[in-house]
Amino acid sequence: IIEPDKDSYRQSTMTKRSVKSIYLSKDEVIRFLQKDTSQYRILPLGSLANENRWSAFQIESIMGYHPAKIYRYNKLKDEVGWNSLGVLQMLNVKYIITTEELPHPAFDLVFTGKLFHQSKYQSTNVYQFKYAIPRAYFTQEVVVIPEMEIQFAMLSKQDFNPLASAIIEKEVGEVEYNPNAQVHISHWSPDKIEIEVSTPTDQFLVLSEIYYPEGWEITSHPDWKIHPVNTILRGLHIPAGAH
């Protein structure tokens, strides 16, 4: 019902043009976040959790609402949640957005300003995650665990460190971590990602993008396989050399 009868006690699904104009206009929090041109994601908490407005400004969020849910991601959210700092790291979370205070040693308050939410401006805090990691990184070791439930148990541990180990479902071959390896994302878009890597040894690269088996291929190396990592991310076995 788009425009219900006045006596029906239902609200109209239509939005006033003035509200839409403000919705699509930058507020103080949006402007602050856009100053950071690195690749990162945010975690909105509380009443902001289902907010989708961020996408209008190309700000990536690990929350939001969509009726069609990716099974692996939704399962992780329900089974593990966001209480593990390691999970926030692997999801490339850099900022926590909340209308409340967040007294936690892992997060620093870096900005307070107005955010347009639920048709009004609200004072909102932006906390920076001290231990945020890049969108793409080499992990020190790989651990083979086929069972999803056991993977969830490992991800739930407070000492889980995505830089130290990556959980995979099948063997990928020998890897030898070398801290001198380099990885750089030269292009990113929803349907194409270009990555430049240089490594003196065979290593395992984790890309903080959601794993989905269909529709993706490594165009420069069609024989390389994309592996599910930590249940929901993508991983590649990278041979020594520059690629």
What function would you assign to each model-found segment?
Residues 45-48, 98-101, 210:
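Structural motif
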Residues 28-33, 82-88, 113-116, 181-184, ...:
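Generic recognition of flexible, low-complexity loop/linker segments
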Residues 2-93, 126-174, 213, 223-224:
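Extracytoplasmic/lumenal acceptor-recognition loop(s) of multi-pass membrane glycoenzymes
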Residues 55-62, 105-124:
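Active-site regions of enzymes building and remodeling cell-envelope glycoconjugates
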Residues 37, 52, 89-91, 120, ...:
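Short, surface-exposed loop/turn motifs at beta-strand boundaries within globular domains
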